[in-house]
Amino acid sequence: MGKRSYEEAEGSNADGQEQNQAQKRNRNPHNRFNPKNIAKRQKTTQKINDGNLSQIKKRVRAIERLLEHKNEKLPANVRNDLERELQAHKQRIVDESDRKLRSKMISKYHMVRFFERKKAMRLAKQLMKQLDETKDEAEIARLKADLHIAEVDLDYALYHPHMETYISLYPKPKDEAAEKDEKSSAAHHLHSSRPPMWTTIEKARQEGKSALEKIRDRRPERDFSKPTSKKTAKKSSSQSEERPAKGKFGKTEEESANESDDGGFFEED
């Protein structure tokens, strides 16, 4: 068997090195060019685009960790793109949580608002009928004031913010006999105190229906300026600073001293 030439040996060595590098590249789980990683990234991106909330939250945490890493020197354009993506994902999370909260609150207070709307509407019709029949000026002024309250009550039941706790205008009396009495209806609570939102609705009525709808559909304000991971880090660090030092058996020195003074763990009442 003859010896191989120098060129043949060099060529075979080069082919072997390339093959080894390709195998290492495919075996490395952190290599971005690994076909498995490429498929995984594409699958994750598809889930994010489809609105998968858990995947969106994971992506938010990953971006925040990347932006907060001091040793990671990112180009300005890459950092700007990541910050814009972070804000967009946070807004999607807020929109989804608000949608769930709105649906929950509407379902929770649906019956209360429905019955109070019916009571206010019935009371307003009664007052309008009395207003048409009376001719006394003092009585007319009183009925107009009561009619205004009933109309605001109706708008309160219609346009109270869906994402806020609904405070009843006509709470049920504790006494069952009073509940059956006619005076326990909306007319009985006509001059009772009203929640602060009632005054807001009363002022918005002067601006028109669009102002009332804006109040009904308003959402709680949120601040996106600070990343969530920093908040949790600060919270954990502050808790660790405030936590007293623990002594033997995992108890604080103060607890151990109190137990020794009181005569042990088992106390008699």
From Swiss-Prot:
Top-rank taxon, per record: Eukaryota
Compartment annotation: Nucleus, Nucleolus
Start-end of Polar residues biased regions: 14-23
GO cellular component, one term: nucleolus
Coiled-coil blocks: 52-157
Compositionally biased residues, Basic and acidic residues: 202-225, 240-254
Extent of Acidic residues compositional bias: 255-269
InterPro entries reported for this sequence: Efg1, EFG1_rRNA-proc
PANTHER family cross-referenced by the UniProt entry: RRNA-PROCESSING PROTEIN EFG1
Keywords (A to Z) from UniProt: Coiled coil, Nucleus, rRNA processing
Provenance organism: Neurospora crassa (strain ATCC 24698 / 74-OR23-1A / CBS 708.71 / DSM 1257 / FGSC 987)
Family: Belongs to the EFG1 family.
Region of interest (Disordered), ranges: 1-53, 177-269
Gene Ontology biological-process entries: maturation of SSU-rRNA from tricistronic rRNA transcript (SSU-rRNA, 5.8S rRNA, LSU-rRNA)
One protein family per Pfam: Efg1
Full protein name: rRNA-processing protein efg1
Function: Involved in rRNA processing.
